[in-house]
Amino acid sequence: CHKGFAPLLPGFTYAEYNNLEDFKSKCDENTIGIMVEPVQGEGGVYPADPEFLKGLREFCDEKKILLMFDEVQTGWGRTGEIMAYMTYGVKPDMVSMAKAIGGGMPIGAMCTSAEIAKVFTPGAHGSTYAANPVCCAAALAEIDEILDNKLYENAKEVGAYFMEQLKSLPCVKEIRGLGLLIGVEFEKPIAFEVKHRAVENKLLITAVRDSIIR
């Protein structure tokens, strides 16, 4: 997954997704936090195992280190809850978010627990897309739209329908996901052909691997 992106940012150690023991083994006295996606989107939509995230929460509490969730792809209704961590009942110390929060406008945000927020002072946290008045107004309007119309409930309902219907296709090997964040893995490398056929029928999807669409 890191191919073409070297050199990677120093100071980070990478562990195997859904492997709690590997995460534990990579931590030492210098570790200040663990960052993880509740659902890995780019690799082909791989939801975290509930016990994996619960185990990370317990481990971070025990070692007094931060648990951070990257919800750029999963946040704000896409997975059937307002935020994906709510599906798991695991509350992180910090959450990064973007994409859906702006309704198409470029904006990112980071939320923390009240305890962590105490260490921030004006100017301590900067962002390329922070504080743009137009984007902030768009984000507030988008949040109202999501919450007032409970779009996350629609994502849960429609996502369940799609996943159930996809099961009947003989070419499908596996279906993974939460809400409307769905990955479909085929028996054969036909993902790009399926993508083009979908576009012809006015359905926007993406092929993340030769045999996986999202």
Identify what each model region corresponds to.
Residues C1-R214:
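Conserved N-terminal phosphate-binding loop of PLP-dependent enzymes in the Aspartate aminotransferase
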